[in-house]
Every structure is written in C-alpha cells, then in structure tokens.
C-alpha cells in the first residue's frame, strides 16, 4: 500500500486486506487478508511491558495472562510469572516460553497445575510434529505424555503466532505420578533428564557410556540419594554393554523394558533425534520400581 516494510518492525492494520509488492529481478504482488484461526487465544501482559527474560534469568514476576476459549468465554485470567525456555530453541526468532501461575489452575481442560509451557515449533513449518508425537505416545502404554492445545499467542498486544500450550514435565499425580522422595530414603521417586547441556546443579556422567544424567525432581539430593542413582545407572549400563550379561537378559532386572520399547518406537516413527545427543529425554523411577522411560 505504498509503505516501505521492514520485517519484524513495520506495524500494519490487517482489519482490511493489505497489498504487498515484493521486488527482486521480478516484481510480485500479494494481497493479504487475515482470518481468525478458531483457536483459543492467550494474552500475556508482562510486568511494566518488559522483555521476557531467557530461561537462564530470573522469572519476570507480576505479569498477567488471560486465556479465551474458542467461544470467547474466559478460560483463565490471573497473575503469572514468565520467562523463556529451551536451549537451542531459545536462539530462534520465534521464542518458546514458560509460565508459572501464582496458584494451580485448570487450563483448556487440562488438570490443575502452576507450570505450563508455550512451544513455538519454529523449526516445524507444519506446526504439527510435536502434537502428532504426543498423540502417538498417548496410544502406547507409556505412563504419561504431556497434554497440549494449539493457541494463538499475544504478548503485550503483539501477535506472536501459533503456539502449543502444554503441560511442563513435573512430578504430580496428574503428570509424572511417582512418590515424592523423602530425605531419609534413597529408592525413589526420581525424575531424571539426559541432556548434553548438563546444566542442572545435581548431575553426573555415567561410567560406562559417559551419558549426562541430571536430577530434575527432586532438584536437590543428598549424598546417599545421589550415589544410589549413580550406582544404579552404572549397573544398568554394565548389564547392557557386557555381551554375555546382555545375552542373558540381565538388563531387564534394571529397567521397565515395555516402557523403553514403547518410547523407542515413538522416537523412531517420528524421527526425533533427541536421544542421539541426548537432549531433553527423561526417565523416572518410583519407590520400589524399575526406571520407566519417558515422558
């Protein structure tokens, strides 16, 4: 419409169709007309209009989130803290975010909790792959798969695009349902993450394969608890990578083999490469039980 456009900077009114002319060696003309996607709407107003900090910084407290259902009724309206999430994904132009509500709340039909994430899916032009992977995992016997709903996100009045609003992986009766670990116990429960970023306070590399294990919940453990898990992982890897012990099936004494098989099938069918690094892959061990793969 005769106004020079600077990507990510120029503000336009799309209440009416807008015509763009793009010139390279050839001139192209496009008319853009926006339509409502029919998805739930998420409006975040940050405290003082501040920029959302990265995951390595403190939460931006004093912010507010309002979520509208598809029929425009209010699903949730209340205070929240917000910051970025992800490691490599935080470096992309479309940022992923984490929300920490002031109190537990049911969001878009998902069970009550304080912690939620907004996945940007920037590398996926279909925007579907995470949700399809979740759907596939839900069809297996895996103990828990995060629930999620597609939404349109607005931050301080700016439309950020399509996001997947889903549950953050946490120990909870409606999420990773394991016992909380008491100080005097060592057997469980534990939520462990394997991640090459290796950025949690309590962590170790396994003795046989050098894999990066981190304690996600509890995020602090005493010496006895730390050593229990470290030795357990060592015994598991020794049973896996000793030819005779593997042939005898000794590794099955240390893991819930059905969950490991289901989890690996999902990884293979969806082409997820995260186990290769590894990044953001999980297992959990309940009191008296074997480690279970996932979510």
Question: Model-found features: residue ranges?
Answer:
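Phosphate/dinucleotide-binding and metal-coordinating scaffold of catalytic cores
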Residues: 16-17, 22-295
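Serine/threonine-rich, repeat-prone extracellular segments and beta-strand-based repeat modules
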Residues: 2-24
